[in-house]
Amino acid sequence: MELETLRSPVNFLQHMLGALPHERALREYESWWETEGEHISDATDRAGTPWLRMFDRGGRRVDEILFAPEYWRGLRQGYKAGVVWRTFEDQSLAASALLGYITCFYDPGLTCPYVISLATAVALDRHGSEALRARFLPPLLRRDDTVWQGATWMTEIKGGSDLGANVETVARPAGDRWLLTGDKYFASNAGADLAVVAARPEGAPQGVRGLALFLLPKRREDGDLNYTVRRLKDKVATRSVPTGEVELRSSEAWLLGSQDRGVHLILEVLNLSRATNALGSMAIAQRALAESADFAAQRIAFGKPVFEHPLMRKQFDERIETLQDGFALGWESILRLNEVWRQKPPYSDRYHLFRLVAHLAKYWTSDVAPQIARWAMEVHGALGVLAEFPVERWFREAMVLTIWEGTCHRQILDGLEVMERKGAHHLLFERLRDAADPIDLAEMRRRVETHLALPQTQREAGAEEIFRALAIFTARTVRHAAEAISQPGRSARRA
């Protein structure tokens, strides 16, 4: 891969996908990052956790998050470019995913408010009443500085993986709305204008089946704050998204969808974010490789550039292959999501296929991205651990994306479940049939089915090995198929 391709997210996207939708808008967005946005991002990362002004001088609760003015200008660039509104105008998630990839190459933290604002808009559009959509959807789709931001608040103090056991926020009916009381411990995009929130209606059963999803605005009908921010988290990275602890005290909210389908709606929100997280991890990997290539081409060791040493070049080329495989798998999850993002329960087989691909993609990409970023630090030697140089940041950022929207452990177990309960692996093998080598496909099918036939304890304990193998097999198969279309000569050489 040419270094100029590696240095540019748009060039890399074009290399992987061929013709891009809205290419002019994508290049204009990249240009803004190169000329202005990157400086804002660096300053935001170095400044650390922003201040929280809880009260104004008159003693009124305001909960203002105090970033520098340049931060807010930078944040709005993505909204103006279309990270939310283009999805509804195009009736496709592709442009939003591409804009998110570019964003993550420069500032992974900013992808979070963009993605969860999109997830808020999609959940509202799919499951909100006509009155709710008319009132709250237009502000999320604005293209100027008045655009609203969304958020998705599920996690509480006891943890986010086991929502059925750990969500203690209670919802009480109050006329045409509900009143929510509880605390959200990891509330990304604290200060958002609108949030979708997991809560348990009074009298609902314990466990995940008793949860429902609610739409909660920042302000009550009377204009007062509808939720308060207890504090902001001091994170190792993604400092451009304020993550806080949010207190709900009889906070006004509206039910989305039906009360008995809440868990499905919550998972819809999470799975959209998982697919975009997979692409984001690869954007970080690309950035880390670009930084290491630039440095290694200039650094002289033993009489020649580090990049020209055979072992270094081999290691670099191996990681470029991993980058391209990971991107192909992440993009496959976007393609499968694009087929089903408007579906409602009960879901089709295509939706269960998307779920499996999303788990595979989120698991593998977020696992390999920190490894690539750590290697990029190693290329820099001792300079790689100094905060004054850019490469250490990408390792910090990659580690956060491993945790976001469910750990690797969670992705494996959820992926195992969708294979066991929905037979999603059969759908995946059918999807890959025309692109995969028949012998390799048969062997992978045999391995998966053999594993699923094991006793439950053995099946879970050994799940990572088979899940990793299936992720890599899927990644390489869909990449080869895509290259056969977009780069036929190159694909033939690989074959």
What are these model-derived regions, one by one?
Residues 352-383:
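Charged, glycine-rich active-site and insertion segments that engage polyanionic ligands
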Residues 128-176, 331-351, 358, 373, ...:
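Internal maturation/activation junctions in enzymes
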Residues 57-146, 188-190, 404:
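Internal helix-loop-helix
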Residues 274-344, 426-487:
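Extended amphipathic alpha-helical segments enriched in small hydrophobics
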Residues 4-8, 383-442:
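Glycine-rich phosphate/cofactor-binding loops in nucleotide/flavin-utilizing enzymes
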Residues 1-89:
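Extended, charge-enriched "interface" segments that sit outside catalytic cores
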Residues 222-226, 230, 235, 242-273, ...:
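A glycine-rich, basic-preceded beta-loop-alpha segment at the flavin cofactor/substrate interface
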Residues 177, 181-226:
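A short core secondary-structure module
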